Amino acid sequence: MFLSPGEGPAAEGGGPGPGEEAPKKKHRRNRTTFTTYQLHQLERAFEASHYPDVYSREELAAKVHLPEVRVQVWFQNRRAKWRRQERLESGSGAVAAPRLPEVPALPFARPPTMPLSLEPWLGPGPPAVPALPRLLGSGPGLQGSFGPHAFSPAFMDGFTLEEGSLRLLAKEHVQALDRAWPSA
């Protein structure tokens, strides 16, 4: 069976005909991963203005080493999130308490009865590590160290913790433990 021009898969859009080019694939951007510093600066700018002008966005983009268009899209997404939160808070009828991000269970938060051994060959560590609730503000020597004011607005706003943020939290935790159990 012979097909005349205008019949068959090429005519139905199944492939390019003679002298035609294949349709170009639409380019899709990879998801942008922001650093903790970038998120902090973007959040500070959002607190100052939900609708920054192009000059402010360009200045901020240069400061955080991002293209202006990424900053613009971040603000669009952040405003959408803000409106969504406002809707949820107004829908509940009461003023909602500020949301804290969910923090995964920390491996170093053990009940006070279990001694902490940093390495098996070093023997037992300090007398005991306080339980997580005590660590967050009421333990001896840790008064207020990890209270609600200890975290930056980026953490308070429900952003997921990035690797750098987790490293910073771990470093702060070690420093707090050093203050609680000073070396001899």
Swiss-Prot record:
GO aspect biological process, one term: visual perception
DNA-binding region extent: 27-86
SMART domains given in the database record: HOX
GO cellular component terms, A-Z: nucleus
CDD domains reported for this sequence: homeodomain
Listed PANTHER family: HOMEOBOX PROTEIN, PUTATIVE-RELATED, RETINA AND ANTERIOR NEURAL FOLD HOMEOBOX PROTEIN 2
Keywords on record: DNA-binding, Homeobox, Nucleus, Sensory transduction, Transcription, Transcription regulation, Vision
Coarse class of the protein's main subcellular location: nucleus
Residue ranges, annotated region (Disordered): 1-32
Superkingdom of this protein's organism: Eukaryota
Pfam families, A to Z: Homeodomain
Entry keyword DNA-binding: yes
Chain segments annotated as coiled-coil in the UniProt record: none
Annotated PROSITE patterns: HOMEOBOX_1, HOMEOBOX_2
Cited function: May be involved in modulating the expression of photoreceptor specific genes. Binds to the Ret-1 and Bat-1 element within the rhodopsin promoter.
Domain comment in the entry: The Homeobox transactivates the Ret-1 element in the presence of CRX and NRL.
Gene name tied to this protein: RAX2
Subcellular location: Nucleus
Species this protein is from: Bos taurus (Bovine)
Protein's name in the database: Retina and anterior neural fold homeobox protein 2
Signal sequence bounds: none
Assembly and interaction partners: Interacts with CRX.
Composition-biased stretches (Low complexity): 1-10
Entry's Gene Ontology molecular function annotations: DNA-binding transcription activator activity, RNA polymerase II-specific; DNA-binding transcription factor activity, RNA polymerase II-specific; RNA polymerase II cis-regulatory region sequence-specific DNA binding
